Amino acid sequence: MIITIFGPPGSGKGTQSSLLIAKYNLKLISVGDLLRNIISSSSELGKKIKGTVESGNLIQDEIICGLLRDQLALVDDNCLLDGFPRNLNQAHFLTQVLQEKYNRDVDIVVELQLDDNIAIDRLKNRLACLDCKSIYSVSSFKSTTCAKCKSTRLEKRIDDADMSAINKRISEYHLQMKGLREYYKGKLLTIDANLSVDEVTQEIESKISCNLV
């Protein structure tokens, strides 16, 4: 089974992806994690990507698609793609690569739909563990240690630090989603991400179960 999950910044893609790969025994390919790892390497590519991310712009398709192709070469056809595709061009690329490698396409597409004001509030308060990628809200999480892996490396993401960049990312997401919804019509499961984590998980699993019947 090949699942892709996307949604606006702050919609909980990483959290839901972690739960889904455990339930359905899938390999995870997270575009966001790949980019953050490259940025932390301080390579020339990392510096270039960091500047793009901090400004709220999208990374060039050439870079993203190259990273994805490399990752797909390492997994079988039971995987979950977190945060890819991000536009119609990337969707066409994904179909081509999956057809070449597995002679198939994506089975299920999950879109997490989130109100803009809630997305902004979550991003302003988001705290991430640099080691295990767990996400917390600074308004409710007062510890200096990650509850999951006990790491003390808790920081705000660089792309959450600037309000204008946040607004730009959200606007760009809505702009790109119009084409993606049409492209994946018939495979698209829309989920209300304004709900609690558990409620979102239940809705996703329920719709996936119905889709697999």
Curated annotation (Swiss-Prot):
Binding site for Zn(2+): 129, 132, 146, 149
InterPro entries for this protein: Adenyl_kin_sub, Adenylat/UMP-CMP_kin, Adenylat_kinase_CS, P-loop_NTPase
Residue numbers spanned by region NMP: 30-59
Subunit details: Monomer.
Cited Pfam families: ADK
Alphabetical UniProt keywords: ATP-binding, Cytoplasm, Kinase, Metal-binding, Nucleotide biosynthesis, Nucleotide-binding, Transferase, Zinc
General function of this protein: Catalyzes the reversible transfer of the terminal phosphate group between ATP and AMP. Plays an important role in cellular energy homeostasis and in adenine nucleotide metabolism.
Enzyme Commission no: 2.7.4.3
GO cellular component: cytoplasm
Protein name: Adenylate kinase
One Gene Ontology molecular-function label: ATP binding
Chain positions recorded as ATP binding sites: 10-15, 126, 135-136, 195
NCBIfam families (alphabetical): adk
